[in-house]
Amino acid sequence: SVLFLCVANSARSQMAEGLARSIFGDAVTVQSAGSAPSRVNPFAIQAMEEVGIDLRTHSSKSVDTIDPASVDLVITL
């Protein structure tokens, strides 16, 4: 499984999560989180819509809610 991690979990990590889910489907568990989560950036939602990826149902999550044992690879953004 992959965890994309950034500060606010509002743009970069959300976009990476959406893109990875689009590429890997159910073959890879993909998550994103932030050290100080806020909300998903509307510009990130709009940019991903332009490439056919819907982030409208995503929400920012704290890294504290992620079980470390469930993650094989952490990518920081």
Placement of each model-derived feature along the sequence:
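Conserved active-site segments centered on acidic
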Residues: 1-67
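Mid-chain, well-packed structural core segment of small domains
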Residues: 66-77
